[in-house]
Amino acid sequence: MSLLTEVETPTRNEWECRCSGSSDPLVVAASIIGILHLILWILDRLFFKCIYRRLKYGLKRGPSTEGVPESMREEYRQEQQSAVDVDDGHFVNIELE
């Protein structure tokens, strides 16, 4: 016999599964894993933009400053800010008539 004929057998009313009332630990574990997988898949599809954006940009916060003295942290912040600051003297203003 095939697995299909052993698990699902036609009855007088309709198709039924013999293992639906089973208390076999393997069946219970498979059911729990299946339900958890379905819930996680639904959550992933609902919130995938938020989740992957957080993973993509949330992890790029710069180097850790744990264990670094406050004076060095401030110096680092100033260096980063000075690298970002733009010198207005390098731009040419063009006035259209």
Swiss-Prot record:
Protein name (Swiss-Prot/TrEMBL): Matrix protein 2
Assembly and binders: Homotetramer; composed of two disulfide-linked dimers held together by non-covalent interactions. May interact with matrix protein 1.
Presence of the UniProt keyword Aminoacyl-tRNA synthetase in the record: no
Record-annotated membrane-spanning stretches: 23-43
UniProt-annotated stretches for the region Disordered: 60-83
Job description of the protein: Forms a proton-selective ion channel that is necessary for the efficient release of the viral genome during virus entry. After attaching to the cell surface, the virion enters the cell by endocytosis. Acidification of the endosome triggers M2 ion channel activity.
Gene: M
Site for Essential for channel activity, possibly by being protonated during channel activation, and by forming the channel gate and the selective filter, residues: H37
Remarks, miscellaneous: When the channel is activated, one or more imidazole moieties of His-37 probably become bi-protonated.
Tagged with keyword Lipoprotein: yes
GO molecular function ontology, one term from the record: monoatomic ion channel activity
Site-annotated residues for Seems to be involved in pH gating: W41
Stated regulation of activity: The M2 protein from most influenza A strains is inhibited by amantadine and rimantadine, resulting in viral uncoating incapacity. Emergence of amantadine-resistant variants is usually rapid.
Single GO cellular component term: host cell plasma membrane
Topology feature Virion surface, residues: 1-22
Organism: Influenza A virus (strain A/Duck/Hong Kong/2986.1/2000 H5N1 genotype C)
